[in-house]
Amino acid sequence: MDPNQHNPPAGHQIVHVRGDSETDLEALFNAVMNPKNTIVPPSVPMRLRKLPDSFFTPPEPKSHSRQASTDAGTAGTVTPHHVRAHSSPASLQLGAVSPGALTSMGPANAPPQHLRQSSYEIPDDMPLPPGWEMAKTPSGQRYFLNHNDQTTTWQDPRKALLQMNQAAPASPVPVQQQNIMNPASGPLPDGWEQAITSEGEIYYINHKNKTTSWLDPRLDPRFAMNQQRISQSAPVKQGSQLPSSPQSGVMSGNNPIRLQQIHIEKERLRIKQELLRQRPQELALRNQLPTSMEQDGGTQNPVSSPGMGQDARNMTTNSSDPFLNSGTYHSRDESTDSGLSMSSYSVPRTPDDFLNSVDEMETGDTLGPGSMATQPSRFPDYLDAIPGTDVDLGTLEGESMAVEGEELMPSLQEALSSDILNDMESVLAATKIDKENFLTWL
């Protein structure tokens, strides 16, 4: 078979047409337009689908009846229960045991007590409590109906009666032992009352706020502290001072530690204030020199404006920090990516950009003879207004500063090495930069 037979040439398309495509498409439209004419395949009836009987029986409302008690029992309180579990020791419920019986097992001299009546099946001839009725499920499991509150339960109420009857004669012994072993002996606080439930559990009633509690109020540390202070104090009326005295004692004990923490916080705040106070000075020092150079390059006759030195001198004399004073000069914000960054202003080496600008100001084409005469008197005054700059003014000095220049030159010649001098010569011999291209922003 030729393989090229199934591969059409480029640019040609093969359309396959099926014989029943039109009929299938018409059938789809007819099924939507005429739904009555369509034949729906019969489905299996619900009764023949092998579903359980409970699927067809609607749930009955939860009510007090024997029919509804099989499914509508108290599911929240029912524990995993087997059919014959009520006759085994596993049916012992720890919640039904009174706290007095549990506390009686704590002391070593107390005899062990075994609740044997809950480990065997209760005979059927024993009468149920008033208002109770016993019934059986279809599977034969027994449950109990409480007509008093209209509830059903799996637990036999006769077990609680037997446990309460056995715990009743033994209850005075745990109470006496509790009074001996527990320091919470004595009368109850004012407004409290002790009571016992039907299952033998002891609880306490607070008549002041009409609440009940399982906790003995005599075990409350606040009540014990108040009783101790009342017994130790004289009959002086100090009721209003009792609640505040523990807090005052705690504060007096922690007073030196609190003072030390406050002192440390003050030191931290003082250091932060010093750093914030030094930060504007550094930023202004970094940005003032490039900003002034930009102003000199942007004006038509930069050297012939003698007011700049006077303003700078006024800024230094009017306040301790000339850069924090509000004047007519606006400094540029700090730019980390600028080519004119003065981040190395503390280095003794003279910046290259500054030397280029000085050379340009000396040999500019637009400078006249009159403006050259005013330059030595203006430029040093401007540099004097900037604190902390290590700029050599030997090349800019006039006749008035010749004595100071002679004093500085020997020390500079001794400190400079041949490498630094070669770098200075290469910088000075470089091509002059135009004023328009002097400031290059990156």
Curated annotation (Swiss-Prot):
Knockout or disruption consequences:
Embryos display a small head with smaller eyes than normal and fewer cartilages in the branchial arches. Marked increase in cell death in brain. Incomplete epiboly at gastrulation, characterized by blastopore closure defects and impaired axis formation.
User: What is the stated purpose of this protein?
Assistant: Transcriptional regulator which can act both as a coactivator and a corepressor and is the critical downstream regulatory target in the Hippo signaling pathway that plays a pivotal role in organ size control and tumor suppression by restricting proliferation and promoting apoptosis. Required for expansion of the neural plate and neural plate border zone progenitor pools. Acts as a direct regulator of pax3 expression via interaction with tead1. Plays a key role in tissue tension and 3D tissue shape by regulating cortical actomyosin network formation.
Q: Which SUPFAM superfamilies does this entry report, sorted A to Z? A: WW domain
Q: Where in the cell is it found?
A: Cytoplasm; Nucleus; Cell junction, Tight junction; Cell membrane
Q: Which region ranges are annotated with the description Disordered?
A: 51-89, 97-116, 230-254, 286-374
**Which GO terms of type biological process are on file?**
blood vessel morphogenesis; BMP signaling pathway; brain development; cartilage development; cell adhesion; cilium assembly; determination of heart left/right asymmetry; dorsal/ventral axis specification
- Which Gene3D superfamilies does this one have? 2.20.70.10, 6.20.430.10
Keyword Phosphoprotein in record: yes
Residues annotated with Phosphoserine modification: 21, 69, 87, 119
Q: Where is the composition biased (Polar residues)?
A: 288-304, 313-329, 337-347
Q: How is it modified after translation?
A: Phosphorylated by lats1 and lats2; leading to cytoplasmic translocation and inactivation.
- What PROSITE patterns does its record include? WW_DOMAIN_1, WW_DOMAIN_2
Q: Which residues form the WW domain?
A: 126-159, 186-219
Name the tissues where it is expressed.
Expressed in the notochord, brain, eyes, branchial arches and pectoral fins.
Coiled-coil portions: 258-279
Q: What is this protein called?
A: Transcriptional coactivator YAP1
Query: Region (Transactivation domain) spans which residues?
Result: 247-442
Name the family the entry cites. Belongs to the YAP1 family.
* GO cellular-component term (any): nucleus
Key words, A-Z: Activator, Cell junction, Cell membrane, Coiled coil, Cytoplasm, Membrane, Nucleus, Phosphoprotein, Repeat, Repressor, Tight junction, Transcription, Transcription regulation
UniProt keyword annotation of Glycoprotein present: no
Molecular function (GO) terms listed?
Answer: transcription coactivator activity; transcription corepressor activity
Task: Give start-end positions of Low complexity composition bias.
Answer: 238-249
